[in-house]
Regions:
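Donor nucleotide-sugar binding/catalytic pocket of nucleotide-sugar-dependent glycosyltransferases
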Residues: 1-36, 112-115
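Nucleotide-sugar donor-binding and catalytic loop/hinge architecture
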Residues: 30-50, 77-80
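Conserved donor-binding/catalytic core segment of Leloir-type glycosyltransferases
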Residues: 44-61, 67, 85-89
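A short hydrophobic beta-strand element within the catalytic core of glycosyltransferases
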Residues: 168-169
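Aromatic "clamp/platform" in nucleotide-sugar-dependent glycosyltransferases that forms part
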Residues: 173
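Short hydrophobic beta-strand element within catalytic cores of glycosyltransferases
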Residues: 190-194
Length: 195
C-alpha cells in the first residue's frame, strides 16, 4: 500500500510521492544474542549502558549539550553499571570532544568511537586514541581511522553499530529530520532528539 495510492483515493489525483532516502531493509534490531556477541568482540561489558550519536562532527551538532546531559544524568542517577557514550564520527573535524568531556568531568574511558580500516574495511568500537591506528583484524599498520566521509562503514556495519546502543541521542541546533534519527528508529532504539 503506497502513500501515493492513499492520497489518490482521498481525491488528490494529481499528487505523487517519492520514496524516503533510507533503505529500510538495512536497519533493524538484531537478536539480543547477536548484540551481546558484538559487544564481547569489542571488549564492552554485556550490561553496559550505551548512549550513541551518529553524526558528522560539525559545530551545529550540540556535542556540548550531550556531554553536559550525560554528566548530569550520571551524577543524579549514579548508575551501578558501566556507562558509555558512543560517538560514530570523525574526530579531526568540529568539536574537540575529549577537551569538552574534561570540562564536564567525563573520563575519556567512557567515550567510545568507531574506527574503520582503510585496508580491510572492518570496523572496531573502542576508546579514541588518535587517528592512524593499527588494525587488529588485518594487521595493517596505521590503517584504522575514525569513520569519515572518505572512509566509512557499509550499511550492514552501521546497523551493527546502532545495535551496540541502548538509547540514541541526536542533539543539534539546526537541520531537520536527519537520517541517523530514522535509522536509529528502525533499529528500535529509544531516540532523544532536539525539539
Amino acid at each position: 500500500f503506497s502513500a501515493t495510492k492513499a492520497l489518490n483515493e482521498m481525491g488528490h489525483k494529481h499528487v505523487k510521492t517519492v520514496h524516503g532516502c533510507i533503505e529500510s531493509k538495512y536497519f533493524f534490531r538484531l537478536p539480543d544474542e547477536e548484540r551481546l556477541k558484538l559487544r564481547r568482540q569489542n571488549n564492552i561489558e554485556d550490561d553496559a549502558f550505551i548512549t550513541g550519536f551518529v553524526f558528522r562532527n560539525q559545530l551545529r551538532k550540540s556535542v556540548p549539550n550531550l556531554l553536559e546531559g550525560y554528566a548530569k544524568w550520571k551524577n543524579e542517577n549514579k548508575p551501578n553499571k558501566k556507562t558509555y557514550l558512543l560517538f560514530h564520527t570523525y574526530w579531526k573535524e568540529g568539536w574537540g570532544i575529549h577537551k569538552l568531556a574534561e570540562e564536564y568531568g567525563i573520563s575519556h574511558e567512557e567515550i567510545l568511537t568507531t574506527y574503520v580500516c582503510r585496508k580491510c574495511s572492518r570496523y572496531q568500537i573502542k576508546k579514541y586514541t588518535g587517528e592512524d591506528q593499527n588494525c587488529p583484524h588485518c594487521k595493517g599498520e596505521k590503517s584504522q581511522v575514525t569513520t569519515n566521509v572518505g572512509c566509512g562503514v557499509r550499511e550492514n556495519q552501521l546497523n551493527e553499530i546502532y545495535n551496540f546502543m541502548d538509547v540514541y541521542c541526536h542533539p543539534f541546533t539546526s537541520g531537520g529530520q536527519e537520517i541517523p534519527i530514522q535509522e536509529a528508529k528502525l533499529t528500535e532504539l529509544i531516540t532523544l532528539v532536539t525539539n
